[in-house]
Amino acid sequence: FEPAAKEENIRLSDKQQKLAVRMAGQLTEIVNQYIDASAISFSIIAWPLPSIGDRFEAIMDETIKVNNLDNDLFRSIQQKMIDAIDGAEYMHITGMNGNRTDLKVALWQLQDPAKETVFENCCADVNIPVGEIFTSPVLAGTNGTLHVSSVYLNGLNYRNLSLRFEDGCVAEADCSNYEDREENQKYLRQNLLQNHETLPMGEFAIGTNTTAYAMARKFDITQLMPILIMEKTGPHFAIGDTCYSHSEDHKVYNTDGKEIVARENEKSRLRDTDPEQAYFNVHTDITIPYDEISAITACFADGRQVDIIREGKFCLEGTEALNEPLNI
């Protein structure tokens, strides 16, 4: 869906925008006051509806396949990626085929590599389907441009979406939905930034579900895919809160026994002293398709570089099996 810019469209005033942001924050605080997030869990899965069209049965068959991929296989492959990245200073992501992404994502520095890790190895235990690895970026030092030629977020299309980050926060946002740049800015402010002046990068992830990516391309349903699946179909970046929002003090571990220590950033660190500045009550995943990725590279302090993806394909030794569905 791509709304037309009309004078008759209902828009919040500046005062109302500030009230909406404040209300969302207070509502979240009330929920967390009565629900202990560390004491509960969930599992979520997505299926197509018959309204998807006359190929419903074929799409359902493919979705069943996607939702039942080998959990142990993906855990093993993703662990190889995490082991290769741990200890890096930052990730460097660049685009190709018209994608202008050139972004450095600063990573948490490990104090005890034998017991700690930066990325969570996310399989199909909570979010189904498998799989991704994700982390909470360090905001300071996270700089550059994130660009996607076309992406659907919360049902809305963004054409040529471009976000420029300075120290992990959105410093400039643009898109080409409308001829009038002012209308583009309003569209982004109201829908993407959700009335915030800026948002931090709360998550950097590498989605590994190439089978889901191939399904979306095969049936030309990328615009219809729920974010639960789409976030697994390529590297993605979430603007807003981290994945550990309001649960930063609850220790979590990968199956290898290492504690995932990158659970907070410079914003959420203010949760005890200035909670209104710590949380944004927004978490929007922006996925770059594999065919627009030139490289995702782990960069180390000693100058060493390790490619995870090169020219749209997984290239780290031990991850090659992920490329099989990409031969479409």
Where do the PLM segments sit?
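Short acidic-glycine loop/turn motifs at beta-strand connectors
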Residues: 97-99, 165-169, 300-302
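Glycine-anchored, exposed beta-strand/edge motif detector
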Residues: 233, 239, 247-253, 264-272
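Flexible loop/turn segments at secondary-structure boundaries
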Residues: 2-8, 51-53, 100-103, 112-113, ...
